[in-house]
């Protein structure tokens, strides 16, 4: 298992997997952390997966991922079209995507939704992440939203002013 550090280590971070239920979940939830990691480990490969989208939002999601990932050495961006709000009912098909993903990549670090998130789609992705990637370092991100389900984080990543401004600029793009 990768030992997490924002500084240079004997074991450099090489592969990150980002999982988001909806367009802009990853950017809002862990975009600043990703920008910090990319600046520290530019030789990264990032797999960026968004599970719910439509044609217009898929274009926006891809453009946003491209902006956030412009500093990495390689990337794969996938946007699926699962129906928003129905992940619990599409769980078997989504699980099949996770099983294929497990065969395709072996990430050092995975970002997924917080397990206590009140949105059903977010919870499904969290459960499938922990079920599928049992021997990986998994960090959960929270998304501030109307139902106020921000918990007590066990990891806080300080962002520099420049990183914060970059994240905001990308989100407004």
Where are these regions (language model features)?
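A conserved mid-domain beta-alpha-beta active-site/ligand-binding segment of alpha/beta enzyme cores
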Residues: 157-173
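Phosphate-binding/catalytic loops
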Residues: 147-161
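Active-site beta-strand->loop->alpha-helix modules in alpha/beta enzyme cores, enriched
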Residues: 1-23, 27-146, 151
């Amino acid at each position: 298992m990768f030992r997490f550090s924002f500084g240079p280590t004997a074991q450099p971070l090489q592969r990150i997997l980002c999982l988001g239920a909806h367009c802009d979940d990853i950017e809002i939830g862990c975009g600043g952390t990703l920008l910090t990691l990319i600046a520290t480990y530019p030789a990264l490969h990032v797999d960026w997966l968004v599970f719910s989208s439509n044609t217009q939002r898929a274009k926006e999601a891809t453009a946003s991922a491209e902006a956030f990932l412009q500093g990495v050495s390689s990337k794969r961006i996938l946007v699926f079209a699962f129906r928003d709000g129905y992940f619990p009912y599409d769980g078997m098909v989504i699980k099949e995507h996770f099983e294929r993903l497990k065969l395709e990549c072996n990430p050092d670090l995975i970002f997924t939704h917080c397990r206590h998130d009140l949105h059903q789609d977010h919870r499904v992705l969290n459960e499938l992440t922990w079920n599928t990637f049992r021997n990986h370092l998994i960090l959960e991100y929270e998304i501030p939203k109307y139902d106020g389900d921000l918990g007590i984080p066990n990891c806080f990543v300080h962002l520099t002013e420049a990183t914060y401004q970059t994240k905001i600029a990308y989100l407004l793009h």
